[in-house]
Design a protein with these regions (language model features):
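HotDog/MaoC-like acyl-thioester-processing domains
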Residues: 1-7, 87-118
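Glycine-rich loops and low-complexity Gly/Arg-rich segments
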Residues: 36-41, 76, 85, 100-102, ...
Length: 118
């Protein structure tokens, strides 16, 4: 039987963040921080306008893992995040994961993940 995953395998998931994404995420999470939902207040912030929730864009990493690599049925155990720049409505976010280690016996992988914005 061949290995489910191999070191070096990678996958990407890309999505353009929309107004609806931000509003729905605020409603689901209860995070109505003006930085996300109020353009007037957000324009006074260091970002100069509204930004998407950081965890919204981090969710694209989850989508990549759950739907592409390793794929459906994957149980996502841990993640460490660092937000390096804001994501704005209209930005396209690409989440990329790469297999760094694969333990066939335990069926566990260690993945590198990266999020880029354009």
């Amino acid at each position: 039987m061949s290995a489910l995953l191999q070191v070096g395998q990678s996958a990407e998931f890309a999505k353009t963040v929309t107004e609806s994404d931000v509003v729905l995420f605020a409603g689901i999470t209860g995070d109505f921080n003006p930085a996300h939902v109020n353009e007037v207040e957000a324009s006074k912030s260091r970002f100069g306008g509204r930004i998407a929730h950081g965890i919204l864009s981090a969710g694209f990493i989850s989508a990549c893992i759950a739907m592409k690599l390793p794929g459906p049925g994957t149980i996502y155990l841990t993640q460490s995040l660092k937000f390096t720049r804001p994501v704005r409505i209209g930005d396209t976010v690409t989440a990329r994961v790469e297999v760094l280690e694969w333990n066939e016996g335990k069926r566990r992988a260690r993945l590198a993940r990266r999020r880029s914005t354009s």
